[in-house]
Amino acid sequence: MDNVLVIIGPTASGKTKLAIEIAKRANGEIISADSMQIYKYMDIGTAKPDEEEKEGIKHYLIDEVTPDEEFSVARFKELALKYIDEILSKGKLPIVAGGTGLYINSLIYNLEFSDTICDWELRKKLEQEAKEKGNEYLHNKLKEIDPKAAEKIHMNNVKRVIRAIEVYTYTKKPISVHQEESRKNPPRHNFILIGITMDREKLYDRINKRVDLMLEKGLVKEVEKLVEMGYDKSTIAMQGLGYKEILSYLRGERSLDEAVEILKRDTRRYAKRQMTWFRKIENVYWINKDEFDSDEKIIKNLKYYLATFGIFL
């Protein structure tokens, strides 16, 4: 099987930077596994690399759809596999980098997702319930039918909560059972996993600084522009981190300082959930950034590890 490198880790840990450094040395191209970077017009709040930061390395699954378009895990897997084959056909190394756990799992475990199970009426009804009764009410509904899925899916991830309820309603089988059964499928490629970790307080400090930098770069203007384009609170992408908080400020629901503090807090919580998710993945070669005083030393460490798979940096 062909090698595919996968770089995982919490938000603000430096996945993209490491992926670019490896791609430059190993003749690679990068596939983003980030559920927010797929959206056009949302650049600052999703921390997309700009052209200068990409350093000439081709990136896939960035700016794939507009903010009001549906983009499922099944669609991610389909496109990611297509781009992996495309990169391999050029004799290059595919590098998947991102922090969306379900996207990563869909590839490394070759999970099967049925997009054919779809009930628009039920979906609209559940969306309305979430608006009227709150996210927690809907999450409790999921808890009753699929406690395992409820444990993994955050109550604010309304889209995934609804999807899990929808699958159970149609199949009478919890989505967690579907996922466990589909894990028996052999993976399509030899996925080599590298994980980035660091001291929690250092990571939280990086997150706080990243949010401040987003504000400096013009996050408020970016959200204002999206609102002008017709994207509002009901748009799926606008419920993402960095957008819902600034939107609440623009709607006069809280001050900018409050919105920023909530964004920092919720991003830290998200990073914690990401690490909990990634720690459950087996055969990850973990890089603790605290043990290295430069990126060059991290590359040197990886050089010996990746050489065992025939990947030379």
Curated annotation (Swiss-Prot):
<dbReference type="InterPro" id="IPR018022">
    <property type="entry name" value="IPT"/>
</dbReference>
<feature type="binding site">
    <location>
        <begin position="9"/>
        <end position="16"/>
    </location>
    <ligand>
        <name>ATP</name>
    </ligand>
</feature>
<dbReference type="GO" id="GO:0052381">
    <property type="term" value="F:tRNA dimethylallyltransferase activity"/>
</dbReference>
<comment type="similarity">
    <text>Belongs to the IPP transferase family.</text>
</comment>
<dbReference type="GO" id="GO:0006400">
    <property type="term" value="P:tRNA modification"/>
</dbReference>
<comment type="function">
    <text>Catalyzes the transfer of a dimethylallyl group onto the adenine at position 37 in tRNAs that read codons beginning with uridine, leading to the formation of N6-(dimethylallyl)adenosine (i(6)A).</text>
</comment>
<keyword id="KW-0067">ATP-binding</keyword>
<dbReference type="Pfam" id="PF01715">
    <property type="entry name" value="IPPT"/>
</dbReference>
<keyword id="KW-0460">Magnesium</keyword>
<keyword id="KW-0547">Nucleotide-binding</keyword>
<protein>
    <recommendedName>
        <fullName>tRNA dimethylallyltransferase</fullName>
        <ecNumber>2.5.1.75</ecNumber>
    </recommendedName>
</protein>
<comment type="subunit">
    <text>Monomer.</text>
</comment>
<feature type="site" description="Interaction with substrate tRNA">
    <location>
        <position position="123"/>
    </location>
</feature>
<feature type="region of interest" description="Interaction with substrate tRNA">
    <location>
        <begin position="34"/>
        <end position="37"/>
    </location>
</feature>
<dbReference type="InterPro" id="IPR027417">
    <property type="entry name" value="P-loop_NTPase"/>
</dbReference>
<feature type="binding site">
    <location>
        <begin position="11"/>
        <end position="16"/>
    </location>
    <ligand>
        <name>substrate</name>
    </ligand>
</feature>
<keyword id="KW-0808">Transferase</keyword>
<feature type="site" description="Interaction with substrate tRNA">
    <location>
        <position position="100"/>
    </location>
</feature>
<dbReference type="InterPro" id="IPR039657">
    <property type="entry name" value="Dimethylallyltransferase"/>
</dbReference>
<dbReference type="GO" id="GO:0005524">
    <property type="term" value="F:ATP binding"/>
</dbReference>
<keyword id="KW-0819">tRNA processing</keyword>
